[in-house]
Amino acid sequence: MPGGVPWSAYLKMLSSSLLAMCAGAQVVHWYYRPDLTIPEIPPKPGELKTELLGLKERRHEPHVSQQ
């Protein structure tokens, strides 16, 4: 088996890792409570609160270094 580990130990470790990963994801979703609703009308550009406004400003003003 992988790394010289017996099948029983490998499956125990695999299942416990998977269980811990799923439990951790569930706890994070309970804590942060993400909004998983899908709006019927998509928002217009600029209405999203997650837009990176600093990135938008940098695109319009390219910085040229003087050497």
Curated annotation (Swiss-Prot):
InterPro entries cross-referenced by the UniProt entry: BRAWNIN
Transmembrane segments: 9-25
GO biological process, one term: mitochondrial respiratory chain complex III assembly
Topological domains annotated Mitochondrial intermembrane: 26-67
Major localisation: mitochondrion
Alphabetical UniProt keywords: Membrane, Mitochondrion, Mitochondrion inner membrane, Signal-anchor, Transmembrane, Transmembrane helix
Lipid bilayer topology: Single-pass type II membrane protein
Entry superkingdom: Eukaryota
Keyword Membrane annotated: yes
Record-linked Pfam families: DUF4516 (PF14990)
GO CC, one annotated term: mitochondrion
Phenotype seen when the gene is deleted: Uqcc6 deficiency leads to complete loss of mitochondrial respiratory chain complex III, resulting in growth retardation and a mild increase in blood lactate levels and significantly decreased exercise tolerance. The subunits of mitochondrial respiratory chain complex I, II, IV, and V are not affected.
Organ and tissue specificity: Highly expressed in brown adipose, cardiac and skeletal muscle (at protein level).
Subcellular localization, as worded in the UniProt entry: Mitochondrion inner membrane
Topology feature Mitochondrial matrix, residues: 1-8
Oligomeric form and interacting partners: Interacts with UQCRC1. Interacts with UQCRQ. Interacts with UQCC5. Forms a complex, named COMB/coordinator of mitochondrial CYTB biogenesis, composed of UQCC1, UQCC2, UQCC4, UQCC5 and UQCC6; stabilizes nascent cytochrome b/MT-CYB and promotes its membrane insertion. Forms a complex, named COMA, composed of UQCC1, UQCC2 and UQCC4; activates MT-CYB translation. Forms a complex, named COMC, composed of UQCC1, UQCC2; UQCC3 and UQCC4; mediates MT-CYB hemylation and association with the first nuclear-encoded complex III subunit UQCRQ. Interacts with MT-CYB.
Cited function: Required for the assembly and stability of the mitochondrial ubiquinol-cytochrome c reductase complex (complex III or cytochrome b-c1 complex), a multisubunit transmembrane complex that is part of the mitochondrial electron transport chain (ETC) which drives oxidative phosphorylation. Mediates early complex III biogenesis. Participates in regulating the levels of electron transport chain proteins, and therefore energy supply, in response to changes in energy demand. Also required for cytochrome c oxidase complex (complex IV) assembly.
Similarity annotation: Belongs to the UQCC6 family.
Protein name stated in the entry: Ubiquinol-cytochrome c reductase complex assembly factor 6
Gene name as annotated: Uqcc6
